[in-house]
Design a protein with these regions (language model features):
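C-terminal interaction-tip segments
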Residues: 190-209
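Short carbohydrate-recognition loop motifs
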Residues: 68-88
Length: 209
């Protein structure tokens, strides 16, 4: 097989077409790192936080967020909705697991992103959203404490916005499983109808490949 060797750098202003294989192969660690790549979390994969065999109810109840907007395909997309918190206090949860993909860079950035706000009217008190995340020990328990370092931010606005929660990545490795739970907390004194609403949840990761 013919072989041509080049010494030093090569600059190619156009495309390179390779008919065979790259030998030796390019290791994942040699690929440029992409910071905070987005991975969607499907609402249909979320569970009742204290009964993981149960999916979220269609209507929020007790301490569980509801999976709404799923009955009018082509008109509405699914979203999470709390119970009516008008003139009361509501604290409701949703839980999911997320396995870090092979391309995640061990020990690097990991975040949870939630796009949320008030559904119909703002509370005359408070509305916050928070996240906790624990690393599974792969034996039915968790390793360490809550990895989320971000305090629950205010989301009491009719203009929905994205809230970001930092997950400490020091002990995270590709293939590891995170057990995540979000909580919406609303306190209101005299408003007729007040709902927490979330339209998107994502995991953001530093990756290579």
């Amino acid at each position: 097989m013919a072989r041509t060797e080049f010494q030093g750098s090569i600059f190619v202003p156009g495309d390179i077409t390779i008919a065979g294989n790259i030998v030796p192969g390019i290791s994942r660690s040699s690929i440029v790192q992409e910071d905070l790549a987005e991975y969607g979390v499907s609402f249909t994969e979320m569970r009742v936080h204290d009964a993981l065999s149960s999916l979220l109810p269609a209507t929020a109840t007790a301490d569980d967020l509801g999976l709404a907007g799923s009955t009018t395909y082509g008109t509405a997309s699914p979203y999470l909705l709390s119970s009516n918190a008008g003139s009361t206090t509501v604290t409701q949860y949703a839980r999911w697991q997320f396995q870090l993909p092979p391309e995640y860079v061990a020990g690097q950035s990991c975040r949870v992103s939630i796009h949320c706000g008030a559904g119909t009217a703002v509370s005359d008190g408070t509305m916050t959203v928070d996240v906790s995340a624990y690393l599974s020990d792969d034996e039915g328990a968790v390793s360490g404490s809550d990895l989320v370092t971000t305090s629950g931010p205010d989301c009491n606005s009719l203009t929905m916005s994205t809230k970001s929660f930092v997950v400490t990545g020091t002990t995270l490795t590709p293939g590891a499983t995170l057990d995540c739970r979000m909580v919406a907390a609303v306190t209101d004194s005299a408003t007729a109808t007040v709902y927490f609403k979330a339209g998107r949840v994502k995991m953001l990761l530093d990756i290579q490949g």
